[in-house]
């Protein structure tokens, strides 16, 4: 059994999360900014389908990408040099999260419900949630979004409508975070794709101990400048 949360965001210790399914910690609560920010600071995130209550997770181990450790293949470096995409920060957050919410397969479902979308749009308005966008001729063709707290970035989802569009966005994110002194990008669940890009598994205890410091250091909330994205692009040309 897992606890049912209500009232204040008083999450149980992450050590109480289930092993099967890995990381399931609690149910209930809200998707308000106070709840979401309290969760992320503790290494907890929401993930559930539309027919479920809000479920809170903290898997062990945790997949983490150190910004400086991102692996860029030769073909991706060539794409970056050729400037095939214009990369922007925080100009189309609603469009990015809507694209991420589209089912990956015809008839498939999505965990990014309208409720989730509204919650993260609110965090974007408050300066905590950010989008990194890849554009071609004024059309959004890829990107990602996530939460920035102190020196930690919590990646949520990405999408791509053209080859390398989301990878280019990730490269710009990592470069931007490295400039700002961020310690880590939380990738949440382990996937072969993210491992190939340089992400590594970190014991949950170590990850959460890091968060206790990272989320209380570094820059505060606020919009990211598109000029910073343009500077990063020029460095690859």
Curated annotation (Swiss-Prot):
It is found in: Cytoplasm. This is Leucyl/phenylalanyl-tRNA--protein transferase. The keyword Transferase applies. It comes from the Bacteria. Keywords: Acyltransferase, Cytoplasm, Transferase. One of its GO terms (molecular function) is leucyl-tRNA--protein transferase activity. One of its GO terms (biological process) is protein catabolic process. Pfam families: Leu_Phe_trans. It catalyses: N-terminal L-lysyl-[protein] + L-leucyl-tRNA(Leu) = N-terminal L-leucyl-L-lysyl-[protein] + tRNA(Leu) + H(+); N-terminal L-arginyl-[protein] + L-leucyl-tRNA(Leu) = N-terminal L-leucyl-L-arginyl-[protein] + tRNA(Leu) + H(+); L-phenylalanyl-tRNA(Phe) + an N-terminal L-alpha-aminoacyl-[protein] = an N-terminal L-phenylalanyl-L-alpha-aminoacyl-[protein] + tRNA(Phe). One of its GO terms (cellular component) is cytoplasm. Functions in the N-end rule pathway of protein degradation where it conjugates Leu, Phe and, less efficiently, Met from aminoacyl-tRNAs to the N-termini of proteins containing an N-terminal arginine or lysine. The gene is aat. Its main location: cytoplasm. Its EC number is 2.3.2.6. Belongs to the L/F-transferase family. It comes from Aromatoleum aromaticum (strain DSM 19018 / LMG 30748 / EbN1).
